[in-house]
Amino acid sequence: MSDQVNIIPIQKIGEDQRGSTHIFETDRTGEFIIAFRNKGSLSGRHYHKGRSDHKNPEKIIIMKGEATVNWIDIKTGEKGVAKAIAPAMVTIAPWVWHEVVADEDMVVFELNALADGQGDTFQLEQ
């Protein structure tokens, strides 16, 4: 695991014939994003500078499915790959370009609103 991208397992607190129940903690409130991604699709492909509190770090929860997170630290050039298997929280530090590859159909819960990325989302060529 690195300081740039972390995969944090989501704690299971119960399971029965209906399925399982998991918990996580966050200090974030307000609007959130739920994304349904098809197998093979790419998301992200950008980085944040941490101007928005909710992008410092960026936090997404893989609720269903599996993803590969490719990343590059913009400041150091360090590169890495992390595998997230639901349920898991992915944290992405500022100044880390990231690409989320849906290894299978997946459901993603983002702990931020669309407005949080405005003015704090950059492509590699910027």
Q: What are these model-derived regions, one by one?
A:
Residues 1-34:
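A short, N-terminal "cap"/entry segment at the start of jelly-roll beta-barrel domains
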Residues 3-6, 99-126:
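Double-stranded beta-helix
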Residues 27, 62, 85, 93-95, ...:
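A short, compositionally biased micro-patch
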Residues 51, 75-77, 107, 115-116:
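Short, surface-exposed beta-strand-loop junctions and turns on beta-sheet-rich folds
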Residues 21, 45, 69-70, 92, ...:
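Short beta-strand His + acidic residue motifs that chelate non-heme Fe in jelly-roll/DSBH
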Residues 55-72:
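Glycine- and acidic-residue-biased ligand/ion/polar-headgroup-sensing regions
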Residues 14, 73-94:
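Short acidic-glycine-tyrosine-enriched beta hairpin
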Residues 14, 34-56:
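Conserved short histidine dyad/triad with adjacent acidic residue
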